[in-house]
């Protein structure tokens, strides 16, 4: 059994304290956990028990940070993992937080896909939408499941035409360089060649 000889609030982080056992620095802990378990100078504690409390403290803080992180916008599972890694939490802490976030549905990659398509399907083609989702850590398998669940195919041609009209508003479409520039723009947005070609013909015909 060791004795806590000092509990010191960290200078650079008032939410954390340094714990000293028998005159030597032993661990850091979040202040809330320290107060919760009545840890102060003079208290005797087993080192194993102290380590358990440190782990609990890390879990609570990591979970609180993750919940705050998702409060502003939907996040993917991978975004949560990457965020906590940047905060230098250990893998076991991150796994714990991710499990809790999934359990309480703070994160749901399928819901993220649905929301992403609803928000950006009028700006990008399918291939670009899928690429963007994969870059955020969403699996292609889950994306495919979402695509298969749609009752109707996405009207990518109408979206392509709308974007082309906006982009080409003050451009001469009889100029081959302008047409090439516009085609590259639409391709970069993830539209297929057939949609781009049909959109170009439709917009040109309307003028």
Task: Give the predicted meaning of each segment.
Residues 1-207:
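An alpha-helical, amphipathic repeat domain used for nucleic-acid recognition
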């Amino acid at each position: 059994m060791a004795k806590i000889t000092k509990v010191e609030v960290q200078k650079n982080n008032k939410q954390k304290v340094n714990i000293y056992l028998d005159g030597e620095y032993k661990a850091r802990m979040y202040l809330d956990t320290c107060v919760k378990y009545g840890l102060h100078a003079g208290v005797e504690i087993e080192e194993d028990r102290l380590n358990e409390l440190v782990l609990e403290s890390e879990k609570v803080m990591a979970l609180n940070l993750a919940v705050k992180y998702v409060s502003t916008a939907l996040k993917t599972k991978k975004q949560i993992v990457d965020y906590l890694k940047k905060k230098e939490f250990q893998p076991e802490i991150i796994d714990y937080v991710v499990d809790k976030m999934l359990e309480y549905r703070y994160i749901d990659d399928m819901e993220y896909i649905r929301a992403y398509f609803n928000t950006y399907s009028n700006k990008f083609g399918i291939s670009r939408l899928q690429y963007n989702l994969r870059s955020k850590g969403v699996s292609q398998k889950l994306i495919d499941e979402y695509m298969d669940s749609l009752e109707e195919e996405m009207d990518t041609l109408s979206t392509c035409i709308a974007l082309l009209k906006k982009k080409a508003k003050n451009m001469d479409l009889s100029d081959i360089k302008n047409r090439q520039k516009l085609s590259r723009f639409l391709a970069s947005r993830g539209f297929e060649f057939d949609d781009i070609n049909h959109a170009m013909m439709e917009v040109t015909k309307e003028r």
